[in-house]
Regions:
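Terminal, non-globular segments
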Residues: 1-225
Length: 225
C-alpha cells in the first residue's frame, strides 16, 4: 500500500506547487486566471484531507468525493462560462450547472445515505459535462497555433476520462496484482492526475511567458518612440 500512497502524495505535491505558482502570480491577471487559482488551492485542501483520512482510516473518506466533484464542476463551469465567447454555449453551461445541482439536491434529499458512498450519477454527470466543454473548446480552437488554456483543457480531458472509465467499469476496488506491492486501478488514476498537474504547470508557464513577451514588446515600442 505504501508505493501507491507515495504516488498519490506526489500528485498532491504537484497540485500544491501549481497552487502556489498561480497564487503568487495572480496579481493583475484576468478573471479566468483567478478562477483557476481558487480551484487549485481549494482542491489541494480537499485532496490533503482525503489523503490524511484515507491513510489513517482507509475507506472512510468517500464522503469527501462529493465536495471534490461538486466544487470542481461548479468552479470549472464558471471557468468555461467565461472562456466561451458564443452566447449559446454560455447558456448551455449555465443551464447544465443549474440542472445538475437541482438533480443532485433532490437525489441527496431522497437518499441521504449516498453521502457516505460514491455517487456514480454525480461523478458521471459532472465529469462528462466538463469533458464535453473542454472538447468543444479544443475543437473550436484547433486551427489556432496558440491559445490560452489549451494545456489545461487537454489535461482535464485526460484525467477525467481516466477516472470516469474506472467508475463506469465498476473497477473501483479491483486489484491488478499484490506483489511486490498492492496495485489497483487507482494507481493509474494517480499517474494521470500527475500528468494533469504537469499540463497545468505548462499552462501556468505559457500564460506567464506570454505576459513577459508582451511587456518586452511594450518596452521596445516605448524606446522607439
Amino acid at each position: 500500500m505504501l508505493f501507491p500512497f507515495i504516488i498519490s502524495l506526489a500528485g498532491l505535491f504537484f497540485l500544491l506547487i501549481n497552487g502556489i505558482l498561480f497564487f503568487r502570480t495572480r496579481k493583475d491577471k484576468g478573471f479566468l486566471y483567478q478562477i483557476i487559482t481558487v480551484y487549485l488551492i481549494l482542491l489541494f485542501v480537499e485532496e490533503l484531507c482525503c489523503n490524511i483520512i484515507g491513510f489513517y482510516s482507509p475507506g472512510s473518506n468517500f464522503f469527501l468525493s462529493h465536495y471534490y466533484f461538486l466544487f470542481q464542476f461548479i468552479a470549472l463551469s464558471v471557468f468555461f462560462y467565461n472562456l466561451f465567447r458564443n452566447i449559446i454555449l454560455k447558456r448551455i453551461v449555465l443551464y447544465c450547472l443549474i440542472l445538475v445541482l437541482m438533480i443532485l439536491i433532490v437525489q441527496y434529499y431522497e437518499t441521504p445515505g449516498l453521502y457516505w458512498e460514491f455517487n456514480f450519477l454525480e461523478i458521471e454527470m459532472t465529469s462528462i459535462l466538463l469533458i464535453i466543454y473542454a472538447l468543444i473548446f479544443l475543437i473550436k480552437n484547433f486551427k489556432r497555433a496558440k491559445h490560452e488554456y489549451l494545456y489545461l483543457c487537454n489535461g482535464l480531458i485526460i484525467y477525467l476520462a481516466s477516472s470516469l472509465s474506472i467508475f463506469l467499469s465498476g473497477n473501483t476496488d479491483s486489484v491488478i496484482f499484490t506483489e511486490p506491492f498492492i496495485l489497483d486501478f487507482w494507481f493509474f488514476n494517480s499517474l494521470f492526475y500527475i500528468l494533469y498537474q504537469f499540463l497545468i504547470f505548462k499552462e501556468w508557464r505559457s500564460l506567464n511567458n506570454k505576459i513577459k513577451v508582451s511587456d518586452t514588446e511594450l518596452i521596445d515600442d516605448s524606446e522607439e518612440l
